[in-house]
Each structure stands twice: as C-alpha cells, then as structure tokens.
C-alpha cells in the first residue's frame, strides 16, 4: 500500500502535539509551538541513480519509500555529470599509499588526548535539535551551531592564522562545512561525515535526533580535528598535504551535499589523494548480542582497494580492536560521491553492516544506545589516518620504482 505524507500526517496528528523525548535525553522543547507545518506535495520529480546506469525519476515521497525499503541512491538531479571528466580521461594514476604506518612516535601523545567527554558533550547538544533534516530550519540552525564549534576549536588551538572553516553553501538551507589545514602542497586528504539526520516517515515533522546517524561520525571527526590541531607542525603547515575535514549536508536526500562539493572539486581539477568517510561510529549492541567480538567495519565494496588496505594497517597499528570486512552497497554514504568524481575513497562503519544500528531514521536514534569507548576507537583511527597521510610524500610513492607503497 502506498502511504503518502498527507495520510501519515492525518494518522499522526493526535501524537504530534506531544513531545518526542526519552527520559534522560536532552529536552528538545515543545514541538512547533506556532502550529504544525503542513507537508508539501508539489509533484516535483527527482532523478536518482540506484546503481551504475540504473536511473529513474521519482517524487520526494517515492524517495523516502525507497529509503524505507533499504534502497540507497544518488539524487543526480543537480549533478548528472559527476564523474564525466574522469570518464573522458584516457588514463588515471593508480592510487598508492604507504605500506605501513611510520609516525607512531609522533602520534603517541596526541592519541592520549582524544576525549570521550568532548564527543559526548558535543553530541548531547547536536542531538537536542528537533531534527537536522536538510530542508528544515532546524537543519540550518544545527549547521550554524556546528560551524561555530569547528571555528571555536580552531581558535582554542591558536590556529586561526593558518586554519579556516567555512560553509559550502547549498540552496536547500543547511550548508556543508569544510575546515582546511593547508600543507606544503595542494594535494588534499579529506576526512568526512554527514551532519544531517532524517525521520523517514515524515521528515519535515517528526523528530530525528540522529545520535548515531550521523551525529556519532560528526563528533568523531570533530574530536580528531581538535587533537590534530595540537600538533605544531600541522598548524604551521609543515606537513606535505593539505588536510580537509568535511561535514556534509543532505546525505540522507541522496548524497546531495557531498555531490555538490566533489563536483566542484572535479571541475576545478583538485588533487584529492584520499577520502575517508565516518558514518555511524557508536553502536555495538547487536554485534555483542550476536556473540561477535567488538570491531570496526571496513567497507570493501565500491571503494578504493589500495586506500582500504592502508586503513586496515592503520587500524591494526593504532586501534585496540580488530576490523571486519563488510559491504554496504551502492551510494551508501558520502564517500561514494568522491569515488564517482574519480578520487580514492573509503568508508569505515561501527560494525559489520548486518549488525549496524537499527534505531536510525527514527525518534529512537538516541545517545543512550551508543558506546563512546567504541567511538574513541574510530577517533584513534581517524586521527592516525589524517596524520599519517598529511606527512606522506605522494610524489615519491607514485614513482614506478618506489617499494614502500601499497
């Protein structure tokens, strides 16, 4: 049976005057004191890609129906040509990465500075927004709050003369955020997470705290960003490669924010050496309930195999839990936009995909289900990944006779 937003709203009217809060969770205030917003059904169509070459036109309601059924996709309406420049290029350099980590001594004091408290404090506020749906005013407000946290982090580190953070603007209201730590070259290493959340039943009305998806990834990379700025060499730009931390808008709508960014990078000819996505980093209950050891999930489909291998050796070196290989399908998070644009990308999630958080996209995606100890493991990996690749001499690695590369 097809269920429209209008019929759902009628069913839920008696409930929406209540509060979508749990005991012990942050107060999200009375919902819509000026009256319940009406969902709009304009009949506008969106062009989506469910797999390479498999495209169709759908309404917004149909987008959410697909998402509720577990389907992921690119919404290519605004960026139908993402990757076209790559396709026109006759040859492309093979991605190469260090065979093993080499900055253990330098990283040791910084790894000790990673803080569960910092992540929890940020996530508590971040989930207090009624929703972070990218078309909502709450989504705009949460993005502005997040940019302030990133800028405050830069200022507290005394790095504001060298490091900058800006909105990457979008027409739907919630902007993406890019923090840039310039290196000696314009070769760039990107670390990303998505800042938006969604309730797939009535995105513009129902609460979507999004603690795990992807509040957890958002604060994980923010904590890695905070600590990496404690490195004087990093702040002063003594590292080889520029580091960027991205917080994408509108991932839930079909990777919209990341597509806009990587489409821009592709057209500008930006040299992105690696992109790592952190989407959902805090839920381990189903893994443990299944009798499996706590681990991080390394995605192995639709990713760059050489970058993924490098991430495995980073986890082995810097994390105290193992990794498991797992798959998530086509267009399952923002790394897919980087990959489509021709850049080596990878994705690490909280567990094997089949044991990932089953509370997402609902009012129940709450902090109480998350493990900050587990998120700390993701932060360790993220910090080490960023630091190791910041100092990597890619020009030397890419020489045909170089032996210290994957």
UniProtKB/Swiss-Prot annotation:
One of its GO terms (molecular function) is metalloexopeptidase activity. The keyword Disulfide bond applies. CDD domains: M28_AAP. Zn(2+) 2 binds at residues 213, 252, 361. It is an enzyme of class 3 (hydrolase). Disulfide bonds join 328-332. Zn(2+) 1 binds at residues 194, 213, 279. This is Leucine aminopeptidase 1. GO terms for cellular component: extracellular region. Pfam families: Peptidase_M28 (PF04389). InterPro entries: M28_fam (IPR045175), Peptidase_M28 (IPR007484). Gene3D superfamilies: Zn peptidases. Glycans are attached at residues 186, 306.
């Amino acid at each position: 049976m097809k269920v429209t937003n209008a019929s759902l709203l009628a069913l839920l009217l008696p409930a929406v005057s209540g509060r979508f809060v749990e005991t012990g969770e942050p107060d999200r205030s009375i919902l819509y004191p000026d009256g319940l917003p009406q969902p709009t059904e304009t009949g506008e169509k969106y062009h989506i890609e469910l797999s390479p070459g498999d495209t169709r036109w759908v309404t917004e309601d149909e987008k959410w129906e697909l998402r509720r059924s577990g389907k992921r996709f690119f919404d290519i309406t605004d960026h139908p040509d993402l990757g076209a420049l790559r396709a026109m290029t006759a040859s492309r350099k093979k991605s190469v990465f260090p065979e093993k980590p080499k900055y253990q001594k330098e990283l040791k004091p910084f790894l000790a500075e990673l803080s569960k408290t910092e992540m929890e404090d940020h996530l508590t506020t971040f989930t207090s927004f009624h929703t972070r749906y990218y078309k909502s005013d709450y989504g705009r407000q949460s993005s502005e709050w997040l940019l302030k946290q990133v800028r405050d982090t830069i200022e507290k580190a005394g790095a504001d003369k060298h490091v900058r953070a800006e909105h990457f603007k979008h027409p739907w209201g919630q902007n993406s955020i890019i923090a840039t730590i310039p290196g000696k070259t314009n070769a760039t290493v990107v670390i990303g997470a998505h800042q938006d959340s969604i309730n797939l039943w009535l995105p513009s009305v129902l609460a979507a705290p999004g603690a795990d998806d992807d509040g957890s990834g958002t604060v994980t990379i923010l904590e890695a960003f905070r600590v990496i700025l404690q490195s004087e060499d990093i702040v002063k730009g003594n590292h080889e490669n520029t580091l960027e931390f991205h917080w994408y808008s509108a991932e839930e709508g079909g990777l919209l924010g990341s597509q806009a960014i990587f489409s821009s990078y592709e057209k500008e000819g930006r040299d992105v050496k690696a992109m790592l996505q952190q989407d959902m980093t805090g839920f381990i209950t189903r893994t443990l309930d299944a009798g499996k050891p706590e681990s991080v999930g390394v995605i192995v489909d639709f990713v760059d195999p050489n970058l993924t291998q490098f991430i495995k050796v980073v986890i082995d070196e810097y994390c105290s839990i193992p990794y498991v290989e797992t798959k998530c399908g086509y267009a399952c998070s923002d790394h897919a936009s980087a990959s489509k644009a021709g850049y080596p990308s990878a994705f690490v999630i909280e567990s094997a995909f089949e044991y990932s958080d089953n509370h997402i996209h609902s009012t129940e995606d709450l902090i109480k289900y998350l493990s900050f100890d587990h998120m700390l493991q993701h932060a360790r990996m993220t910090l080490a990944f960023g630091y190791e690749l910041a100092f990597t001499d890619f020009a030397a690695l890419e020489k045909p006779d170089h032996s210290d590369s994957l």
